[in-house]
Amino acid sequence: MAHHKSALKRIKQNKRKQFRNKSIRSGLRTFIKNVREAVEAKDAAKAKEALQAAIPVIDKAATKGIIHANAASRNVSRLTKLVNTLG
């Protein structure tokens, strides 16, 4: 256990950030899952709608540093390609 006051503060800050990041990452996975489920159901309209909802969430997570910018770009690219297969 940390003995310095500053180290104790960092532990508290890290816990707060961990909970916040976990919440955002979980929401991110939900949005991605919604797009994939719509594609599996072969519902083009719902898939496009889900994709339009997912892209800003993915980009915001990258901006906040929760996921890497390249990972965000890769997710958007793959989801877009997946939705475009429906036509």
Swiss-Prot record:
Top-rank taxon: Bacteria
Q: Where is this region: Disordered?
A: 1-22
Give the molecular function GO annotations.
Answer: small ribosomal subunit rRNA binding; structural constituent of ribosome
InterPro entries, per the entry: Ribosomal_bS20, Ribosomal_bS20_sf
Give the keywords, sorted.
Ribonucleoprotein, Ribosomal protein, RNA-binding, rRNA-binding
Please name the Gene3D superfamilies in this protein's record: Ribosomal protein S20
Provide the Gene Ontology terms for cellular component: cytosol; small ribosomal subunit
Alphabetical GO biological process terms: translation
Family stated for the protein in its record = Belongs to the bacterial ribosomal protein bS20 family.
PANTHER family xrefs: 30S RIBOSOMAL PROTEIN S20, SMALL RIBOSOMAL SUBUNIT PROTEIN BS20C
Quote the function comment for this protein: Binds directly to 16S ribosomal RNA.
Q: What is this protein called?
A: Small ribosomal subunit protein bS20
In its UniProt entry, the species of origin is given as Geobacter metallireducens (strain ATCC 53774 / DSM 7210 / GS-15)
Gene coding for it: rpsT
